[in-house]
Amino acid sequence: MTATRRVSRPGPVRWMFYLGAVVAIAWLATQAFYFAQIAVWNYVNPRTTSFMRSDAWRLSQDRPDLSVQHTWVPYDQISRNLKRAIIASEDANFVNNNGYETDAILQAWERNKAKGKIVRGGSTITQQLARNLFLSREKSYIRKGQELIITWMLETLMDKERIFEIYLNSVEWGNGVYGAEAAAHYYFKTSASKLTAAQSARLAVMLPQPKYFDEHRGSPYLAQRSRVIARRMGAAELPD
C-alpha cells in the first residue's frame, strides 16, 4: 500500500512574506515609474498633472459649465516679475538648496505635532512640484514621505530652470486655473509675459490657498502681503 504524501500549505508567516514581497515590488515599480516619467519630462512638457486631473473630475461632477484652464508657455515667455515674486514668497533659497529646507521641515514637524495633525508642510518649490505632478491633496505622513522621494528625483534629473519652468506652468492658481498663462488671463486679462510687479506679487501670495483667494480677492491680507512680496522681489535670485 502506497503512503499518501501530505502537501503542506503555506503558514501565516509565509503568507505574510508573500504579501510583503508583493507590496515591496509594487512600491519599487511605482518609484521606477515616477523616475522614468521625470526623466522624460526633461525633454517633453507634461500635458497634465495629478492635481489637474483631480480638478477636471471634480468640475465635471459639480460644475459642468467649467473646465480646467491651462496653457503651456516656455520659460522665457514668463515675466521675470512673476519668477522673482514666487521665489520671494515661496522659496527664497530655491536656486541654492537641494530641494529641501531642513529648518522649515523641522518647524513644520513641531507645529504639526503640537496640533496633532498635519497643518503645515514646510514645502520648497520642488516639493510643491512633486506633489502637484504625482500626488493628491491628502495630508498624511506617508504622502509627505513620497513627496520627499519625488523631490530627490526631480533635483537629481533636472536642473533648477527646468524644475521652475514646469512649476510655473502647472501650479494651481484658482478654481480650475493652472499655470502662469491661464492665471494671467483669468485675473488680469493679460499674458504671462506682460505681468507687472504688482500683479506678480499678488499671484505669488495666492499660491498657498489659490481657491480661497480666488473667492476672496478683496482680502486685506492678500493686499498687505502682496506689498511685502513686491518689496522683496528685487533680492530674489533666479535660476537663469
From Swiss-Prot:
Recorded GO MF terms: pentosyltransferase activity; peptidoglycan glycosyltransferase activity
Domain of life: Bacteria
Subcellular location: Cell inner membrane
The entry's keywords: Cell inner membrane, Cell membrane, Cell shape, Cell wall biogenesis/degradation, Glycosyltransferase, Membrane, Peptidoglycan synthesis, Transferase, Transmembrane, Transmembrane helix
Pathway: Cell wall biogenesis; peptidoglycan biosynthesis
Its EC number(s): 2.4.99.28
Protein name stated in the entry: Biosynthetic peptidoglycan transglycosylase
Species name: Paraburkholderia xenovorans (strain LB400)
Lineage: Bacteria, Pseudomonadati, Pseudomonadota, Betaproteobacteria, Burkholderiales
Gene this chain is encoded by: mtgA
